[in-house]
């Protein structure tokens, strides 16, 4: 797509993504703790299509933020959901989706590009179109967490907020499904993430 030039990320795209990541880090007070910013998922591999999201990962050692890794993970996830909910950022027609990843956890993906170092950490291969398990789980977990968030709002009797969030989420799930079908394969990241959500 329009993101790559001679196997490296387009400079304008890179600058914009770095600005987004830095703004998120500043607003969530994790500035100075971000070890790397990576671009991953289908747009960083050969599984992309017109409805693919831009998966922007901020790598942080959760132990640097607090002792309880699970609580920090939940907090980072909540901050990420709130950010994605209130910022509808598009680049070249693709929505930017932020993730905060524990830098001590291994992340397996078909393609991972470091924005900080401007180089491939995992270079995708056109011949090896394998299932990107981490991308599938990340996508499904992201939606599942948002479903939980809607439930929480409803239980707290924030009905208007829950309704607004549910409508937005419904559109997101529809997009996920149609994106998977458009990608043409039953093995697309979006289609498998949709099935994972549906069956859980």
Give names to the regions the model predicted.
Residues 1-52, 60-200:
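Catalytic core of pol beta-like nucleotidyltransferases
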């Amino acid at each position: 797509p329009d993101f790559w030039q001679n196997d490296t990320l387009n400079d304008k795209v890179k600058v914009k993504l770095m600005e987004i990541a830095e703004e998120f880090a500043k607003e969530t007070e994790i500035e100075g703790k971000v070890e790397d910013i990576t671009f991953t998922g289908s747009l960083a591999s050969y599984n992309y299509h017109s409805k693919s999201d831009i998966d922007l990962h901020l790598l942080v050692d959760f132990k640097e933020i607090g002792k309880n890794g699970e609580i920090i993970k939940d907090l980072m996830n909540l901050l990420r959901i709130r950010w994605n909910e209130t910022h509808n950022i598009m680049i070249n027609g693709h929505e930017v989706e932020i993730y905060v990843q524990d830098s001590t956890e291994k992340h397996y993906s078909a393609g991972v590009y470091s924005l900080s170092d401007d180089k491939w950490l995992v270079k995708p291969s056109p011949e090896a179109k394998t299932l990107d398990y981490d991308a599938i789980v990340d996508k499904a977990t992201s939606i599942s967490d948002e479903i939980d968030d809607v439930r929480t709002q409803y239980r707290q009797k924030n009905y208007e907020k829950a309704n607004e969030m549910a409508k937005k989420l419904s559109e997101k799930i529809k997009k996920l499904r149609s994106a998977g079908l458009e990608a043409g394969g039953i093995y697309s990241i979006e289609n498998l993430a949709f099935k994972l959500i549906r069956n859980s």
